[in-house]
Amino acid sequence: MSVVAGAGLVGVVKSVTSNSAVVLLMSDPSFRLGVRIAGSQVMGVLSGTGGKSYALQLLDATEDVNLGDQLIARGSEGDKPFVPGVPVGTVTWVDNATGQLTKHANVEGFVKLTSLGVVSVILSTTADDPRDSLIPPKPKATPTPTVTVTVTPSPSKS
């Protein structure tokens, strides 16, 4: 289950007892999350580094990623453990080296993990899939005009 604070994603619940839960923070080196650049379909994998920033690996090196791009969680099948659309962070550095199979960047999270107070655990989501909000709607089919020719006899002049 996703763990969030006011500004975005904090981590994921790893285990639960009757009184508490153990959360794997985004900063943990074993943390992995599928993300996308907000407003696009560009996807990548975000990894914890053990520090204050995160490592982003884009799956397609030909895609553009820019300083200031915002990332959101891509989500998991069945929304567990990650729900889609949760804000993750902002790109702060991009490696524009050519000839690589993937593109790398650094990301600063929206949530400061060193100063957390109350967090929330997302137990379920709505039936609406927020991932669809980034996909443009399918174009409506253009109606085919129907032309009907009616021959009207003209009055004859006598």
Each language-model region and where it sits:
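Extracytoplasmic/periplasmic terminal helices and flexible tails
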Residues: 1-158
